[in-house]
Structures are given as C-alpha cells and as structure tokens.
From Swiss-Prot:
The lineage of its organism: Bacteria, Bacillati, Cyanobacteriota, Cyanophyceae, Synechococcales. Pathway: Amino-acid biosynthesis; L-lysine biosynthesis via DAP pathway; (S)-tetrahydrodipicolinate from L-aspartate: step 4/4. It comes from Synechococcus sp. (strain RCC307). It comes from the Bacteria. It catalyses: (S)-2,3,4,5-tetrahydrodipicolinate + NAD(+) + H2O = (2S,4S)-4-hydroxy-2,3,4,5-tetrahydrodipicolinate + NADH + H(+); (S)-2,3,4,5-tetrahydrodipicolinate + NADP(+) + H2O = (2S,4S)-4-hydroxy-2,3,4,5-tetrahydrodipicolinate + NADPH + H(+). The active site is at 162 (proton donor/acceptor), 166 (proton donor). This is 4-hydroxy-tetrahydrodipicolinate reductase. Gene3D superfamilies: Dihydrodipicolinate Reductase, domain 2, NAD(P)-binding Rossmann-like Domain. Coiled coil: none annotated. Its EC number is 1.17.1.8. It is found in: Cytoplasm. Catalyzes the conversion of 4-hydroxy-tetrahydrodipicolinate (HTPA) to tetrahydrodipicolinate.
Length: 273
C-alpha cells in the first residue's frame, strides 16, 4: 500500500516496543521502516525474526539518529514511536523533530520544563507530535472521572503500581491524573493533626496542592492505578488495571494515525480522542 504510515520504533526489543512492532505489522495502514534498540549483540538482526514474527526485512540498529535520518530521506511523513528510557527521551524527541520525523512518545519521565522546551522546538519546526503518559482508553476515562470527583471531595490520595523494572516514580500517568484533578485550583487534604513520619517517605510524595502520590514496584505487576477519595462516612475509589500490554495498542495506533495532523506537540491521549 502506497498510503501506509511509515513507522520507526525505538526500544524495539523492550516489552512495549515489541508489542508496538506486532501492532504495526498487523495494521494494514502502517509500515515498519525502522527498529532501534541498544541491546548488545543484536545489531543487524532482522527485528521480525528476533520477535518471532517472521522476516520483516527491517534490521535492528543502535544508531538512533542514523535511523531517523534514513527514515526522513526514504520515507517522508515517518512517525517515531519511542518506548526507551527517561534518561534519553528528551534527546530522542528533540532529534525526531530536527529530522522531521513526527514523535509519538510513550516513554515517561519528561519534566514540565522539558515538555515546554520540546513544544517550543516543535512549534519552531512547524511540526506536531504527541507525548502520551498512558495509551489506555480506560485510563483516560479514569482520569476524567477523577477530575470530576475532585470537585466534590477535599481529601484524595493516588496510588500507582508497576512492575519492578520501571525506572521513574511516580509514573507519568499518576502525575497526569493529579494535574487534571488540580485544574480546579483547590487545596486537598487539609491537615487535622500534625503528622510525624517515623520512616521518611511513608506518606508518599506531597504535591503543592496537598495531593499525595504513592508508588509500588513489584514483579508480576504491569500497570495499575487507584485514586481514593474520602469523605465523612465514605470512601470512593477509582481503579484501573492493565494486565497485558496489548491493552495499549489501540491507543498507540490511534495516535500514530492522527499525530501527523497535529499542529503542535500535545500531552495526553485525551487530546486525540
């Protein structure tokens, strides 16, 4: 198909990257044109064979900028899907914009000032892009419900649970949820007693709004989040569980299909729904 969307995947051998490659491979309107991963000893290997998908005629490379340069030259309108590491995601996003490859960033860990800088850089390049902390439609619905409930409850805490290989804490999804709840401009969790932590950090991370965020890391988990609200005589709990990374693929493909139509760098899947 001549109208397929060219896709480069960074973090191709990671858990999310592998799922993205499978999804792109089976999507009739997408074409995998690049696969980047820093795993030692895999350079030049066919990514399809590496993932048990059969030969895809796309060789693994560790050369991030080289892959972007090649995609921009041979596949105009290419999209980068990045699931790598918080330490490199800023540079990856900036490089994609510089090469004219539209970024779809699933890697979390970007600081607010970094997001602002990237948005400005994209605007100067007249490009769009998307930074998506969570590609689950169910999680977007939870976030919207949490923002609505925050109007009526003055006490709330957030708990996020992930696998023990996740590098950043709290998760970008949890931070995004808190930000949506804070758009009301209210303060949460007014102290009724003077608290004393006998173990530092026991009460979680404290945001200026008074919201507390708690992070749990355990093997066997994928991605889970709760928002707990408390009122006189009641507790209201919102929870979302992801048991398999396949749950994210509809959101990933939706973003890949829409991102080139954007005129700016956007943050959050809700901006595309």
């Amino acid at each position: 198909m001549t109208d397929q969307i060219p896709v480069v995947v960074a973090g191709a051998l990671g858990r999310m990257g592998a799922e993205v490659i499978k999804a792109v491979h089976t999507a009739g309107d997408c074409q995998l044109v690049g696969a980047i991963d820093t795993c030692p000893g895999r350079e030049g290997e066919d990514v399809g064979l590496a993932l048990g998908l059969g030969e895809l005629e796309v060789a693994l490379t560790q050369d991030f900028e080289g892959a972007l340069c090649l995609a921009s030259q041979q596949h105009p309108g290419a999209v980068l899907v990045d699931f790598t590491h918080p330490k490199v995601v800023y540079e990856h996003t900036r490089a994609a914009i510089a090469y004219g490859v539209t970024p779809v960033i699933g890697t979390t860990g970007l600081a607010p000032e970094q997001l602002q800088e990237l948005a400005s850089f994209a605007a100067k390049a007249s490009m769009g892009g998307a930074v998506i902390p969570n590609f689950s439609v169910g999680m977007v619905l939870l976030q919207q419900a949490a923002a609505a409930a925050a109007r009526f409850y003055d006490h709330a805490e957030l708990v996020e649970l992930h696998h023990n290989r996740k590098a950043d804490a709290p998760s970008g999804t949890c931070i995004k949820t808190a930000e949506l709840m804070e758009e009301l401009g209210k303060q949460f969790n007014a102290q009724e007693v003077e608290e004393h932590e006998t173990l530092e950090g026991s009460r979680g991370g404290l945001r200026p709004s008074g919201l507390r965020l708690h992070s749990i890391r355990l093997p066997g988990l994928v991605a889970h989040q709760e928002v707990q609200f408390g009122g006189a005589g009641e507790r209201y709990v919102l929870r979302h569980d992801t048991f398999d990374r396949a749950a994210y693929m509809p959101g990933v493909l939706l973003t890949v299909r829409k991102v080139r139509q954007l005129g700016a760098l956007v943050y959050g899947l809700e901006r595309l729904l």
